[in-house]
Every structure is written in structure tokens, then in C-alpha cells.
Amino acid sequence: MSKCLHAPVEFIATEIFYFADQVKAINSYSQQSKVISASRDSELALFKGIEPIVNSDNTLPQFCHQQISIMIMADSIDLLESRVAYISQRLVKQGIIHVREDINLAQTFWSQLPGNFNYIRRVSYNIIDNVAALAALHHYPVGMQHSRWGRSVTIFRTECGTPYFMNFHDESAKGHTCIIGGAQSGRATIANFLLSEASKYSPTILYLTNRNNAQVFIKGIEGTWHNGDLPFNPLSYLESSDDLLELFKIITGNYFNNLTDSEIECITELAIAVMDMPPESRSLIKIIKDFNFKDYSAGASVKKRIKLFISDDKCSKIFNQSSTLELQDNNVTAINLADYTDYQFNQSYTPQVGEKPEIYHNKLQTLHCLRSGIIFSLIKKFSLLASSEPKILVVDNMPDLIVEQVFMNLIKQITEQLSENNGIILSVVQVNQNDQFYYSDFWKKWLKFNNTKIILPTNIRNLPIAEICNLSTREAKKFNTISPNSRLFMVKQDNNYVIVELNLEGFPAIRKLLSAEEEDLNLFHKIMQKIGDDAPSAWLSDVYDQFQNSE
């Protein structure tokens, strides 16, 4: 019956049963057993399961009279005929013997009502253990109408046309969510759609990315967008010596070349000293000058590591400037970290003639320390915002931003701290072919911390998303039936899964507002230059019209 519950057909299934005389019932089963034995069909005998009932040495099982009816409904005769044939076909595929009523049609209809035993026409014997074996009506997930933040984020339409109440949080009230899919699968569109629907909670949003496709969306929800130079110093964002210690571990390369116990002791005291400094005075140049490294046996090596870090121009600029970027409650802040990614580094890096390979490696490692330090301090500052209002940390293209060696041992602390402060992480992940990241210990650990997973099909052949997402055999079988062009995707939450749809066909402007391509961004910037006002009320309608007509 579960297969029928998934069908796009309205019906009522009714089961009627009442206790039967034991002797009469066992005689009926004995007659059936003799007929089957005469047929010499051993498989049929095994399938029917009559022998164990007839030959049981134990107390006779309890018997009952049983009738099951399925009443199918439709608005026209033709549609009714079609639906009857559809349900009948599904029952046949599952080996369920059934008949279509004609002469007894009226009696069978009235027999569905309580107490109308005189109208029952198709009863048969059954053992009481088989009663009420239709299906649990709650078997098909419907989500939760309310979560920790209030009403559900949105309502998706399932593949069967039923509603699914979508929430970041599961039944344990943990809301970390990961959106996974291949290139051009619609990951950003779904992520930003969920963010727009979550605006009813008035959340504080920190949006970390390495691309510009969400720029129109962020500005449309009155957020601020930061490209290129970052107007903040990570040292000034941290509010505890423990967090400063972690930051110093990151920028001194501890996760690539472990610090000794003596070096850890030195940077621990350094973190305490920096904590006593006013946030606006925390520049690495000043710290190196003021802190007495000579008092520590490993002071010289720690100082050397810090100097090596700020010998890089980007590192020096970030860690020696004043902070003007403020993360405030109920605000939306987006930061494009493209200039700090491996891709941008490889695009701009030109090795010197005769340069040793380790120089490239060391510079890339310094970039990893810088990017990790920036992200760590931003997340810490964001997590500890005083407001109890919802917080959403978005990490777009997570594998391009997160350095797994650094964050491997930090993700548990980060996810738990955000949850305690009414926050969630919404990570967006593009799965690429032959990328070892998705087989790493970090990725396996990350999946465990995400209570909700949204998994999108892809056009890339032989891309093992089911394996990467650790789907069960049943889940993988279902996921592999989804066409990439169907606009369907899988939501996995609370040990259940459901296939839902986000169909924006016919709404090109909304799709582009959620995730803009390069030509859309160019059009947006032209309109902004013409209008000269950043307020969404001044430009949003014009941009919408242009996007709608540019399809």
C-alpha cells in the first residue's frame, strides 16, 4: 500500500475485521492446503504460508474475518477509469490479488461506514497478526510545521504533489544544513531562496563566498557586499585569549608544521598580552615590537614565524590595519574572498627563473594560513553576537574556502557554539569529478555535523554524489532516478528523505535575482550607475523588469 500512498491519486483505503470461529477458520485453511498440495507447486505453498498455520503444534493462532477496500475518487468518469487502472497496475506489480467491484459496488461502499456489517460482501479468513498491515500513513515525510525559529522556512512541493514543510532544524533542534550538487545544478539558487524565505525570522546573516553571483540578491535584501580589500583586522575581532591563541596557531602555521610545546607556551602568553591591548591597537607589527620574545626559550622561533607570515603583502595589510567592518545584529553582511583563494593565487603567481618548488608551496601555505585566520575570526565574532535572534552563517563553495587541515579539529567547537547562540551554518558545496576532498576525513566529519542535507542531481556522468553524501542503498537508488532537468532534489533529515521541487520556470527574473550570471551582473551595475541609489526600493523593480525581459 505504501506505493499507492505515493501515487498522485485520491483514494480511501478501508480495512474491516472481526473475530472468527477458530475451528471454521482452520478448516478453511486446511482445504486450501489440500488444493495447493495437489498442485505440487512448492513455491506457491511457501508463498501462501498456509502450512505453518495448519501444522502448528502450538495454540491455534487467532483468526478473523477481513475485508479491504480501496475507494478511488475523481472529478470525471474518464479520469476515474484512468485512476482505477493506475492503482490496479500498482497492486498487481506488488503481487496483491484484487477485484474491481460491479454488482456489489453499492454494498461495498456502504460497508466502509462503521457498524454496517450487513453490507460486507468480500470477507475472507486471515490471522490476526496480519491485520492493520496496510501502511503507516505518516510513513511519507511531511516535515514540521514549526521549528525552533517558528513557522517552517518554506513549503516545497513533493514529487507526488503533496506539501513538505522545509526547515533548517531537525527534531533535535539542530539546524546546520549542507546543499550539495554539481556545477550548474542550482545550489546557489536554492540556498538564496531559503535565505529569502528565512527573512521572516529577521536573522543576522554572514555570507562568505568566492564569487559574485549572490551580489544582486544580497543587496536586494538590504545587505552589504564587500569585494577585494577587507576593511577589518582579525586580531581586533576576537574577544578571548583562547580564540587569540587559536588565531596565532593558525597564522604561525601550526597545522602544517606543528609548533613545539615551548612555542605553544610562548604564543599562549602572547595571546594573553594581546587580549589586554585595545582592539584598535592590535597590529602584528606593534605586537612584535612590544612583546618580549626573549623571555621565552622558543620566543625567537615564534617571532620568526610571525615575521615570515607578515612578509607577505596581503598578510601584512590585513593584520596591520584598523577595522571598519562591523558585524551587527539583524544585518546581512557578504564578503567575497575570491582574492584569497587557491584559484586566484595560481592565476596570478609567476615563478622566478630557477625558483625551487618549495617556494611556491610555502607561499600557498601562507595564503592558507591567511584565509583560515580571516574566516576563523569572522566566524567567532559572528557566533558571539549578543542578540538571541537567529543567525545564519553561509559558506558558499565551502571546499574552495575552508582549509581542511586547519578546520578539522575546529568544526565541532564552531558548530556547537553557533547552535548554542541560536545560529546555523548553511554550507553550499560543488562536487567535482576526481576531487579527493570528498573522500577526506574532514568531509566525513562535516557531513555528521549537518543535520539537514539537500542533494541535487547533476548532468556530470559517473559523478558518485550518492557515495559522496553517504546515502544508504535505498536512498541512492531513489536519488539516481531523479533527472537533472526535473528541478527535483532530495532533502534528507531525521533519518528520512523526500524528493521535492523548486520550479522557477516562467520566472527568469526571480532566478536571476537569486543567482546572477556575469551578463546579469553587468546589467545590474549599469542600472545602479544610472539610478545612483543603493536602496532596493530605488532599483529593484527596474532590475526585475530588465531581468524578466532579457531572457
What are the roles of these predicted feature ranges?
Residues 160-196, 205-213, 224-229, 345, ...:
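Conserved P-loop NTPase motor cores
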Residues 168, 177, 245-286, 437-551:
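P-loop NTPase motor core of the ASCE superfamily
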Residues 15-16, 69-79, 94-107, 182-185, 225-231, 341, 399, 425-429, ...:
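A generic structural motif
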Residues 201-202:
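Conserved SF1/SF2 helicase motif Ia
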Residues 53-60, 166-167, 321-324:
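Short beta-strand/turn micro-motifs at beta-sheet edges
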Residues 108-164, 210, 215, 219-225, ...:
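P-loop NTPase motor domains
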